[in-house]
Amino acid sequence: MPTDVEIAQAHTLEPITDIANRAGVPSDALIPYGFTKAKIDINRIASENTGKLVLVTGISPTPAGEGKSTVLIGLSDAMRLRGHNSIVAIREPSLGPVMGIKGGAAGGGYSQIVPMEDINLHFTGDFHAITAANNTLAAMIDNHIHQGNTLGIDVRRITWQRCLDVNDRCLRKVVTGLGGKAHGVPTETGFTITAASEIMAILCLALDLTDLEARLARIVVGQTFSSEPVTVGQLNAQGALAALLRDAVNPNLVQTLGGTPALCHGGPFANIAHGCNSLIATKTALSLGDVVLTEAGFGSDLGAEKFFDIKSRVGDLNVAATVVVATVRSLKYNAGVPKDELTTENLEALASGVVNLERHVENIRAFGIEPIVALNKFASDTDAEINQLKAWAETMSVQLIPVEVWAHGGQGALELADAVAVSMQNQTSHHLYDPELGIEASLLTIAQKIYGAADVELSKQARQDLAYLQENGWDRLPVCISKTQYSFSDDPSQLGRPEGHTLHVRNLLPRIGAGFIVALTGDVMTMPGLPKKPAAENIGVENGEIKGLF
């Protein structure tokens, strides 16, 4: 079987102008970046939101991932094969994980968005623009202090960090400004990965360029010596940051291998941010297509919860149908089966691990939607394992439909497409909690209803953070919980369906520009590291073509 990149490179891409015509993008709104990718000028697209929105999420993954994006893309092609004017709205890959554990991140097999090499490596420069804006702000903060510090910024309480789109553990803790007075004030700080920057979250939640600049101005970068918050607006930096992001705010148009238009824009992580593609891209797609398929990172406990409670709240979105992607191997992994034994038939482990899928189904129902389970088939799956899961689905009164989009593209998801077409007709989603009840109430609701926890425990530092939020009137914002993707608890070793645990919150961080409060739990880090054998070792160039992107 050819690799993902070999499949993508063997495919003849349609001109992006043809894809734009298929999507209904006016010619004067198309900004080509070569022949196979483009940006869309959002000022020239009518904001009608007439399409139906379908959310694709997943179960708790194995470290290799379960093919959620692959199923999303294949399903979009299947919907088009069934006569729907479908459009995909998907996140841009982060370069760090591409070079780290994941390799390519634009789908897989015959269910990909293309040109996959461009999308994975630099694309249209959105991540670079976000990185530049983030680091320009960091430079302006340090320069303000160096030039006299009229705002009285306390260097010990600067919370803004520089960012890069890499996995580099050595940058987690650094000291800047060394070398004497001429080189600035020594400051203990660190780097985040670009996908975890608040500017990434802002870009993905802004309604337009005007809203983007207003959100940038509200970013809190630290505190003064008198414990007052310091904002970007006080530094008068929002205009420069907006200028750097002027083009990045427009969504990117590419295509699937099946010729379905795809808006690929923004890429916040779901375990350390809100995990959804840009609201601008989603709303643009809803104005163009009759069915828009989008995804939220990791499982229902992370990306999907944040989609319903953060993104949908900001954008006034209604989710008409939801698909939960599951795999046999992940269910066995959630029963404690070692990674090197996941391809061996194990009905006992499958029966034990299916409780994880059960919780994810219940989670989606908590938002008012009856989910459909898409079983992403692998060659190692046996008939006995699949039949056992079908029997389980009957006891849960949930549809479970096997799909083979990796091998067959849209043809491998036609049954799923038919089920989604029925499901999306009469469903209305809702939020899980009311932010007006306060941060602690929001945290407890999510912990109990989505994670199966009994209680939430705030550390001493988190209590101090809460008091600071309350003093500044920020304690009625939605919460964005930063948590491991491998467990419903904050302990990645607690697989399956842990119940009655305590969610430990160590920090509450104001992300006022984005419009939410980040609750840090467990040991989640905002700058990943590379694995022992990074995917970068397999990537290269032969005769001008990229090789090794899985």
Swiss-Prot record:
InterPro entries the record matches: Formate_THF_ligase, Formate_THF_ligase_CS, P-loop_NTPase
Disulfide bonds: none
Domain of life where this protein originates: Bacteria
Residues that hold ATP according to the record: 62-69
Reaction it catalyzes: (6S)-5,6,7,8-tetrahydrofolate + formate + ATP = (6R)-10-formyltetrahydrofolate + ADP + phosphate
First-tier enzyme category under EC: ligase
Pfam families documented for this protein: FTHFS
Keyword Nucleotide-binding assigned: yes
EC number: 6.3.4.3
UniProt-recorded Gene Ontology molecular function terms: ATP binding; formate-tetrahydrofolate ligase activity
One BP annotation, GO: tetrahydrofolate interconversion
Keywords, in A-Z order: ATP-binding, Ligase, Nucleotide-binding, One-carbon metabolism
Involved pathway(s): One-carbon metabolism; tetrahydrofolate interconversion
Family per record: Belongs to the formate--tetrahydrofolate ligase family.
Protein name: Formate--tetrahydrofolate ligase
Species the sequence originates in: Corynebacterium diphtheriae (strain ATCC 700971 / NCTC 13129 / Biotype gravis)
